């Protein structure tokens, strides 16, 4: 879990911006989207191979 401490003389907007940046770096939102619905292992493998194919031909 991302956690920040609000520094002295730091506005709420600055702290919120810092928190959002930290969450983005940690990949929290992408992980939440990925886990939103269960995905069968066979579907995961299929998506992974399709992504590899796209990268290869790009």
Curated annotation (Swiss-Prot):
Q: Which GO terms describe its cellular component?
A: ribonucleoprotein complex; ribosome
Q: Name one GO biological process term.
A: translation
Query: What residue spans carry the Basic residues bias annotation?
Result: 43-58
Does the UniProt entry include the keyword Ligase? no
Q: Where is this region: Disordered?
A: 30-58
Answer whether the UniProt record assigns the keyword Ribosomal protein to this protein. Answer: yes
PROSITE patterns to which the protein is assigned, alphabetical: RIBOSOMAL_S21
The UniProt GO MF terms for this protein read: structural constituent of ribosome
Q: Which Pfam families match?
A: Ribosomal_S21 (PF01165)
Keyword set, alphabetical order: Ribonucleoprotein, Ribosomal protein
Q: Which domain of life is it from?
A: Bacteria
- Where composition is biased (Basic and acidic residues), the residues are 31-42
Per the similarity annotation, which family is this? Answer: Belongs to the bacterial ribosomal protein bS21 family.
Concerning HAMAP family, the annotation shows: Ribosomal_bS21
Q: Which PANTHER family match?
A: MITOCHONDRIAL 28S RIBOSOMAL PROTEIN S21, SMALL RIBOSOMAL SUBUNIT PROTEIN BS21
What's the protein here called? Answer: Small ribosomal subunit protein bS21
Organism, by scientific name, is Clostridium perfringens (strain 13 / Type A)
Give me the gene this protein comes from: rpsU
């Amino acid at each position: 879990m991302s956690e920040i401490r609000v520094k002295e003389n730091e506005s709420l907007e600055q702290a919120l911006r810092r928190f959002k940046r930290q969450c983005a770096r940690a990949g929290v939102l992408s992980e939440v989207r990925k886990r939103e619905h269960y995905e069968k292992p066979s579907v995961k493998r299929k998506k992974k191979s399709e992504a590899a194919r796209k990268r290869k031909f790009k």
